[in-house]
Design a protein with these regions (language model features):
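Short hydrophobic/aromatic beta-strand immediately N-terminal to the Walker A/P-loop
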Residues: 2-4
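The conserved Walker
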Residues: 9
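Conserved lysine of the Walker
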Residues: 13
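Hydrophobic positions on the alpha1 helix immediately C-terminal to the Walker A/P-loop
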Residues: 16, 20
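Conserved nucleotide-sensing/catalytic segment adjacent to the nucleotide-binding pocket
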Residues: 27-33, 39-90
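Short gly/ser/thr-rich secondary-structure transition/capping motifs
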Residues: 87-96, 108-113, 163-166
């Protein structure tokens, strides 16, 4: 069974996905996050200017993601195959030169802001869930997360939220 969880940034998709994992059990559940499928930068040295420019990219637009790869990975898991999930580093806006193995399990949970907008992914899902949370609550959650986990400043989070998220 493949379950898709979508919702705005900071809505609790990842938390909800981990709740499924906990409830259904790690032996029975593969959790796949759209976040791992962001396209990395061009590989040039990361200068402060380059990092600043990358921070201006609209990561909430479908063009920032490799949906074909994500769909092929979901299909592979559905076919009871193993996959190698890319690892994305939000601090450097880059995909790392390593992967994480994921295996087919009875329950596959896929979460991400745009997964329900992609027909090639939507057709693979048995169930879909949309997490709807008020904008002010999502902003509070995103601010806390991005500062703690992604090394962002308050100003950069506010700017990005107002420019590309909200």
């Amino acid at each position: 069974m493949i379950i898709g969880i979508a919702g705005g940034s900071g809505s609790g998709k990842t938390y909800f996905g981990h709740s499924f994992l906990k409830y259904l059990g790690a032996d029975n559940t593969t959790l796949l996050s759209q976040d791992h499928y962001y396209k990395g930068h061009d590989g040039s040295p990361l200068t402060p200017e380059k990092i600043q420019a990358l921070a201006q990219v609209n990561y909430d637009h479908p063009d920032s993601l490799e949906f074909k790869l994500l769909a092929s990975h979901i299909q592979a898991l559905k076919n009871k195959e193993s996959i190698e999930v890319p690892v994305y580093d939000f601090a450097t806006h880059s995909r790392l030169n390593k992967t994480t193995a994921a295996n087919h399990k009875p329950f596959i949970v896929v979460e991400g802001i745009l997964i329900l907008s992609q027909p090639n992914i939507l057709e693979l899902l048995d169930y879909s869930i949309f997490v709807d949370v008020p904008d002010d609550k999502r902003f509070q959650r995103r601010l806390a997360r991005d500062q703690k986990e992604r090394g962002r400043t308050v100003d950069s989070v506010v700017e990005q939220f107002n420019k590309t998220v909200n």
